[in-house]
Regions:
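A sequence-composition feature that detects small, non-aromatic residues
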Residues: 8-10, 25, 54, 160
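Catalytic centers of nucleases
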Residues: 17-81
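Acidic metal-coordinating catalytic centers involved in nucleic-acid phosphodiester chemistry
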Residues: 1-8, 61-209
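Basic, amphipathic N-terminal segments that precede the first structured/catalytic domain
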Residues: 1-3, 11, 15, 26
Length: 209
């Protein structure tokens, strides 16, 4: 009998997403007016200062590439089109992965002004033109604000936890043997905020970390 592993696979995806949100919080919590909103207009959003707003999509599975990001199913928007829909020309857009098509990665360029993560990649001119052939030209400005983030950890719970513990130390956060407790509490908070259902625009504040 073939086992249905859909639930387990979905849970791994959520674990990876939560680890990415945790990493973002650990690396950036000292920024002025720093806020994270989970499961709102995207997998999560980051705001800081008075004008920074990033929409972040997390893909915790293999075989991710430009083709899959642009693929439409049953007439619905593609992943990339949906990702670029909220916000405006000043917003930042990031898709976070642990695996991406190598031939496409090699064409991308290092983003020298990455704000949230250790590093990220910008699309090449060729890749940008390819995407705009399949998206409305109105997405052109937003696409210039898009970057791809490839994490140093895979979609593996223990590997991600080990990496996050190292990041706590790198950011000068005193753990005193409480690193597991800190990460557990952060994970609990992310899950709690993710479960709130938005019924009107005022409910978005319930998603804030």
């Amino acid at each position: 009998m073939v086992q249905d592993n859909g639930g387990a696979i979905a849970q791994k995806g959520f674990n990876y997403q939560n680890h990415v949100i945790s990493l973002t919080a650990i690396r950036n919590y000292t920024k002025n007016n720093f806020e994270i909103f989970v499961e709102s207009d995207d997998d999560f959003e980051v705001l800081y200062d008075d004008n920074y707003h990033a929409y972040i999509q997390v893909k915790g599975k293999k075989r991710i590439g430009l083709k899959s990001l642009l693929q439409k199913h049953e007439g619905k928007c593609s992943i990339l089109e949906k990702h670029l829909t909220p916000g405006d020309g000043h917003s930042k857009y990031k898709i976070v992965v642990f695996h991406f098509t190598e031939s496409e990665l090699s064409k991308m360029q290092e983003n020298t002004s990455e704000e949230l993560f250790e590093h990220s990649l910008k699309l090449s001119t060729e890749q940008t033109d390819y995407i705009l052939e399949q998206l409305d030209e109105s997405f052109s400005t937003k696409l210039t604000n898009f970057s791809l983030v490839k994490t140093s950890f895979k979609n593996d719970y223990l590997e991600a936890r080990t990496y996050l513990k190292g990041e706590l130390i790198n950011q000068g956060i005193s753990v005193d043997g409480r690193d597991d407790l800190i990460l557990d509490e952060l994970d609990r908070l992310i899950k709690q905020k993710s479960e709130y259902i938005i019924e009107n625009k005022d409910d978005k504040k319930l998603k804030r970390i």
